Amino acid sequence: MKVLIVNPILYTNENRNIKKVNTIKDTMIYDLCLAFKKKGCDVTLAASDLYKPSENESYPLNIIWMRTRLTKLFPPHTLPYCPEVKKIAKSGNFDLIITSEVFSLNSLKLALCTPKNLIVWQELGKHNRIFHGLASKFWYGIVAKTGFKKALIVARSVQSREFISKYCKNVSDTIIDHGVNIEKFTPCREKDNQFAISSQLISRKHIEKSIEAFAKYLNKYDDSAKLYIM
């Protein structure tokens, strides 16, 4: 089975100046590609060239670094525009194409040119703040309703499914969340009395709210529990 995964944004940036990293092998989407690979699929990842790592790496899958255009108009950290995605999708004879987010210029191109074997994996559960939220409301209110009629949309959470169902009719009842690489995170039956949060330590993540909630848990239920922030 030939699978194309379109995910231009490989990791989070706070502004349009994309920071270079040494490797992409610690990203969620790379682990997803490996999971398909282990199932015997022929996997291709299409990503923005701005996210190409600074170090030369070898991969057990195909990676296409798409040229990112019009970066002054379309911020590459939130709305990258990679027009060659259409050519890649149509010329690769793929059995399945997975793209991230309805609010995406690249997803729109795919929804219009290869809708039959396309899955749009929707994470956002509320309007994006790009251009003060006006762009998001226009996109979902008009573009999503007309441009994504034939593509199947699969949400990553209940919140995102409820949100996208307001604008698109072809939303799957099945929710598929982010996976976990069990080679890095080994499941076990024995549990310790502790909680773990994986988050960036930046203001918009509001990690203090999680700490406050944990403090309430300690006071009300169990003051011996531990919290790890990673």
Language-model features: locations:
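Acceptor-binding helix/loop patch of EC 2.4 sugar-transfer enzymes
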Residues: T12-R16, T68, I119-T146
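Conserved nucleotide-sugar phosphate-binding/catalytic loop shared by glycosyltransferases and other
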Residues: Y51-P76
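An amphipathic, basic-hydrophobic alpha-helix
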Residues: R67-T99, S104-L108, L112, K137-K145
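Membrane-proximal helix-turn-helix segments that form the acceptor-binding/catalytic region
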Residues: Y30-L32, L134-V154, E162, Y167
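Conserved donor-binding/catalytic core segment of Leloir-type glycosyltransferases
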Residues: L4-V6, V154, C188-K216, L227-Y228
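N-terminal subdomain of nucleotide-sugar transferases
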Residues: M1-Y51, G92
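Carbohydrate-associated surface elements
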Residues: Q159, G179, K191
